[in-house]
């Protein structure tokens, strides 16, 4: 469709610009919006690799609810939707997006995607970075490792957000 072609041209332009700014280095994009575009992205960029870092829904959904609540507060011209509506929409959206994503990832060759539990990655990021490079058949891990170590060291005091899922939603 026309809208899809427009999106592809715009997205391609952004990626080319980012690649130019980064002197042609391979891009790593962290974009939750791309979770629902996996198949489209793979068709546009057949050599693309996907890292699916997933969380338990009880951790994911409260974060999504928080994001939507903030967006409603910041951008809503009328009275924001009641919290129950935001909760229902968040749960439904997460379920639909991740069902689709899981199906699309399962259709790919193993060397084109990797699934990693967020909690496992946080426990041993260096091991999982190595595993990502191996499974996706990426080159340059040895050269990148010192940069990973420096970055991970800089994040030691990072405090994660902790949102709780209310019992009535479970």
What name fits each language-model region?
Residues 28-32, 118:
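Short His-Asn-centered micro-motif
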Residues 23-26, 49:
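Loop/turn-to-beta-strand initiation segments
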Residues 35-39, 125:
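Short, well-ordered alpha-helical microsegments
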Residues 2-9, 15, 19-22, 65-170:
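PAPS-dependent sulfotransferases, especially Golgi type II membrane carbohydrate sulfotransferases
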Residues 30-31, 41-66:
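Conserved phosphate-donor/acceptor-positioning beta-strand/loop module used by diverse small-molecule
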Residues 1-7, 31, 38:
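Extended, H/D-rich, highly charged conserved domains that either
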């Amino acid at each position: 469709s026309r809208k899809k072609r427009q999106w592809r041209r715009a997205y391609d332009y952004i990626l080319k610009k980012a690649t130019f700014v980064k002197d042609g280095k391979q891009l790593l994009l962290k974009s939750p919006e791309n979770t629902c575009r996996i198949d489209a992205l793979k068709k546009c960029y057949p050599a693309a690799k996907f890292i699916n870092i997933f969380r338990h829904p009880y951790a994911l959904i409260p974060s999504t609810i928080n994001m939507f609540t903030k967006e409603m507060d910041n951008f809503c011209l009328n009275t924001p939707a009641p919290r129950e509506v935001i909760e229902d929409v968040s749960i439904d959206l997460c379920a639909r997006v991740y069902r689709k994503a899981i199906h699309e990832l399962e259709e790919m060759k193993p060397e084109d995607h990797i699934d990693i539990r967020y909690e496992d990655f946080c426990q041993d990021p260096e091991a999982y970075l190595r595993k990502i490079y191996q499974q996706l058949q990426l080159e340059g891990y040895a050269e990148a490792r010192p940069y990973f170590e420096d970055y991970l060291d800089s994040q030691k005091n990072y405090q994660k957000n902790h949102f709780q899922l209310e019992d009535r939603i479970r």
